[in-house]
Amino acid sequence: MVEAMRQDLLRASYLQADETIVPVQMHDGRGADHQAYLWQYGKPGGETVFDFQLGRGREGPIKFLGQWEGILQTDGYQAYDGIGGPKLVHVGCWTHARRKFVDAVKVNPQDGEAIKMVTRMDALSLVDRHARERQMSDEERLALRHEHAESWAEEIRSECETLSRAVLPKSALGQAVAYTLNMWAKLRRCFDYAEVELSNNLAENSMRPVALGRKNWLHVGSAKSGPKVAAIRGCRIFCVNVLRNN
């Protein structure tokens, strides 16, 4: 059943992906939980499939996606680079870039440059909100982005390049600037495809029950149970009765 869900998902041309920690009892005599990962792959507003892996390396997405070719949106974690078929396009998430500058503001609420960058990135989201409120098609939304948001994004890039020469690299602002510039090619691709969201939040949101669950069930009982957890989580989203189909 899980394989059928995976095959159905991979028919999509645009997916979002994310991963989160899942503590696992290994029963190896050490007593400490192993830090495994639950990976999520989904269509924005549609199906989502989970995959359990003991590690956070590239092996997980390589195995799940195979030679899939489409648009993959992530937070930029490097394990997603160099996977899939030769035509796979990796796009970034503007919300993650914005979050780095929000963190800089938390460190220094008087940091005018960080505040300015948050405001500029908020303006990008307002363009998409306007498109949603007017129930625009993906193509109409893309045209609106080109008319307004694309030039604002270029201003963000230019400002980041200026800041990179002036801020301490290890400061919160320096790290936010470095993340944005390192991700720039992927962030910029959000303006190349009509169907792509500016944010990977839909993928992150599907992981929230897992994060909350960690506080309740503490850990997965064994490595063999990990794939079952992934399957049950996916079935719940698909509204599949796990007990009936067991």
Task: List each language-model region with its residue ranges.
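Catalytic center-proximal scaffold of phosphoryl-transfer enzymes
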Residues: 1-246
